[in-house]
Amino acid sequence: MMSYIKQPHYAVNGLTLAGTGMDLLHSAVGYPTNPRKQRRERTTFTRAQLDILESLFAKTRYPDIFMREEVALKINLPESRVQVWFKNRRAKCRQQQQQSTGQAKPRPAKKKTSPARETNSEASTNGQYSPPPPGTAVTPSSSASATVSIWSPASISPIPDPLSAVTNPCMQRSTGYPMTYSQAPAYTQSYGGSSSYFTGLDCGSYLSPMHPQLSAPGATLSPIATPTMGSHLSQSPASLSAQGYGAASLGFTSVDCLDYKDQTASWKLNFNATDCLDYKDQSSWKFQVL
């Protein structure tokens, strides 16, 4: 009998059932009655209330709770409304500052572009001024000093590389020997005597001024050495015709050297393996520099 009485609480439309499922069911049924929050009414401030709030905002933008409560009592509004008003007022102030800075930004941008233009103009002027220094560096005085340093007795004569390939040591040049360059006639200057130019130097023996390729007969001389040799050998046409020299070619072998011994009479060309050039008369020499 008692068991029969206990059973009905399972069959009364589920209202007397106990469990988490029924609790969730009841809670879910309660939500549709109030689906969203009620909207708060907008607060309309009078002019007197705004004056009081603005005066406090001028003093401090972040009033503490005591200041807000005091102002709320003055304007007959709750403290929460005063707090929201200060929050909105600070946001409005930040927005105004951003707008003012946004309007002021183009002006500094223009100021920034003007230095960029100035730097571009300076770069262009620098580009205009950069070419003249190399051009001005090439002056007759500087070129003359360069030639003096090149043709100094202690320096080596600038002979091309093909002419320096010589097997015989007597054909190698030990000191500088001036030659005439036809490409720079504007800077050529003739020096009468060599005794003052080559001071303190033993000019008794000068090596050959030419180093042609001696491997093949008839090797052509360089344009630098050919006119110089022609000028020196013009005093002995008989020896030239006897040896069969052309205008720009020589026929002696790799062991031949030139020997200039007699400076007054006609020069003779002896092609011996052990002889080298001897320049004894130095007063008749003429040197031309670039």
Swiss-Prot record:
Organism of this sequence: Xenopus laevis (African clawed frog)
Main location: nucleus
Alphabetized Pfam families for the sequence: Homeodomain (PF00046), TF_Otx (PF03529)
Protein name as annotated: Homeobox protein otx5-B
Keyword presence, Nucleus: yes
Recorded name of the encoding gene: otx5-b
PANTHER family the UniProt entry points to: CONE-ROD HOMEOBOX PROTEIN, HOMEOBOX PROTEIN
InterPro entries: HD (IPR001356), Homeobox_CS (IPR017970), Homeodomain-like_sf (IPR009057), Otx_TF (IPR003025), Otx_TF_C (IPR013851)
A GO term for molecular function: RNA polymerase II cis-regulatory region sequence-specific DNA binding
Subcellular location(s) of the protein: Nucleus
Stretch list, region Disordered: 93-142
A cellular component annotation (GO) from this entry: nucleus
The keyword DNA-binding belongs to this UniProt entry's keyword annotation: yes
Database matches in CDD domains: homeodomain
Tissue: Initially expressed in the Spemann organizer of early gastrula embryos. Expression in the organizer begins to decrease during late gastrulation and has disappeared by stage 11.5. Expression then persists and intensifies in the anterior neuroectoderm. Exhibits a dynamic expression pattern during neurulation and by neural tube closure (stage 20), expression is restricted to the cement gland anlage and epiphysis (pineal gland) anlagen. During tailbud stages, expression in the cement gland decreases and from stage 24, expression appears in the neural retina.
Biased segments, Polar residues type: 94-103, 116-129
DNA-binding region: 38-97
